[in-house]
């Protein structure tokens, strides 16, 4: 369930951030900020649903998912193919995410 929450959180975070990017860098109208802010609020709420006692650990584990999702956004929305360094970096981050999520706690 955690990965599903992280996946949806990534969609809302990236979408919300892209709304600001589009307004400031692509000349989209200011009203793009409204759905961007709603999207970012949904992102933050979703992270509170992750079963964890520590916010920092939740955010750190989410980071790898965010990176992978951002590269998918790069490819599918911005029509730019991630290069081998993008893919390699994402794999390293996902390995770190797995260690954080599944490491023994004592």
From Swiss-Prot:
InterPro entries per the UniProt record, alphabetical: UPF0060
Residues annotated as transmembrane: 4-24, 30-50, 58-78, 86-106
Recorded GO CC terms: plasma membrane
Annotated Pfam families: UPF0060 (PF02694)
Primary localisation category: membrane
Location of this chain's protein in the cell: Cell inner membrane
Keywords: Cell inner membrane, Cell membrane, Membrane, Transmembrane, Transmembrane helix
Membrane topology: Multi-pass membrane protein
Lineage top rank: taxon: Bacteria
Protein family per UniProt: Belongs to the UPF0060 family.
Record protein name field: UPF0060 membrane protein Rleg2_1018
Lineage: Bacteria, Pseudomonadati, Pseudomonadota, Alphaproteobacteria, Hyphomicrobiales
